[in-house]
Amino acid sequence: MAYTVAAAEGCGRLDRIAVSTDSEEVGRVATACSSGATEVLLRDPGLARDTTSTEDVLLDVLDRLALPDDTAVVTLLPTSPFRGAALITRALDLYLEKGAKSVLSVERKRLKTGVLSPDQRYRPSHPYPAEMHRIEPLLLDNPCIYVTQAGALRRDKLVVVDPCYALEINGIEGLDINDPLDWLMAEAVLAAGLFKS
């Protein structure tokens, strides 16, 4: 949370910064690590379920803050601690330069994908060589940052709407912490001095 609040406040381009949470403890942490520019919005318990989508929460924030349709809504999930203020600025610049309805962060990955049948038979999604360096990289949506026009978000109820533009990020910026292995990777990044806020 502290990294996300610091990046948002450090960007200098966001008119309002809000943390939406159903936890009073998370709200206290957000307030404690803020310079005073971040407001905490405590969510209704109905928006605190495992099935609650990011878009449901964002629509609640749009309504509570009465944001106009032309507002650029920047979504910064706290599970991406290595996203700095400069990355937020790059995403906003791309959004404005292109006249986008949305911008998302993407990572270039070489993947060997397929599906497994009930009898354990593997079927590749497409033919591929054994060596990873010969695989054509794909661009994968990374939840590090989304920028969405408020009106388009209200209309489509999605953070990614057309026309959408992609901001390519590196593996450290895109490190998303969801499980114990991700924590180990984050600790290694910090220990090696690979993240400069």
Q: Which residue stretches match the model-derived regions?
A:
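N-terminal glycine-rich phosphate-binding loop and ensuing alpha1 helix
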Residues: 1-20
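Residues at the starts of beta-strands that form the adenosine-phosphate
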Residues: 15-17, 72, 101
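Residues in the short beta-alpha loop(s) of Rossmann-like NAD(P)-binding domains
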Residues: 21-24, 108
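Short phosphate-binding loop-to-helix
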Residues: 24-72, 83-86, 90
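A generic structural signal for short hydrophobic patches within well-formed alpha-helices
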Residues: 27, 150-154, 183
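Conserved core of the sugar-phosphate nucleotidyltransferase
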Residues: 50, 54-60, 69, 80-170
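Active-site acidic Asp-centered loop
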Residues: 76-77
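Hydrophobic helical membrane-anchoring modules
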Residues: 168, 173-197
